[in-house]
Amino acid sequence: DVVEVLERARRQFGIDGLWSHEETGNGWTYQRDKRVGAWARRHGIAWTEIPQFGVTRRMRSRNGWAKRWEAQMAEPITPAPAALQPLEGIDPGVIPEHPCLELSADVCPQRQTGGRSIGLKELSDFLQHRASRYPRAMSSPNTAFTGCSRLSAYLTWGCLSMREVLQTSRNHSGRGVSSFESRLHWHCHFIQKLEDQPAIEFSDFHPFMRGIRVA
């Protein structure tokens, strides 16, 4: 439980502030975040959440969202720190492998390699060589594997930021690049829907569909 982990860290080391990226998840992560927020307030710890994508919290209206998204994406890219001060005395324990968790081996020989340098290489290769095929290739599983950007994992894990991907993309031109940039916009647009309407995880998005699915 994350609150128990944070509390142990607070007692052992002391915590002056809590920093994380701003996440739009599901109902479970939302309840978790509320418990973390309550824990932080109880101990007088400031919790700073850094926006990960072009999603805005607590919007009263969707009017002007696209203009706000463009403004967020146009902001300067924050440079990476030269170094991070390590915290000594933390034992992460043994990271369990699949047999310990009673899971079968996850054999995936063509799994993508993680890391920022590989993510940047994937982005460059897409924009320079594969983007021209993107509008035609994205819809078929036979061609999407090589015709799409393959950046989802790098965006999800924070190896690349949405802002730097879009800004890099706008140094290139062509129909494929424009189509790709539209999908980046849609990515944040649909996450914004979940941010604004978290209940759609548990109910039909369109009210006319209520009752069609049997529980």
Model features per residue range: what roles?
Residues H43-I45, G64-I212:
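Glycine/tryptophan-enriched, flexible segments
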Residues A215:
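Long, charged, mostly alpha-helical binding arms that flank functional sites
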Residues D1-L84, G176:
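Trp/Phe/Arg-rich N-terminal binding region typifying the photolyase-homology
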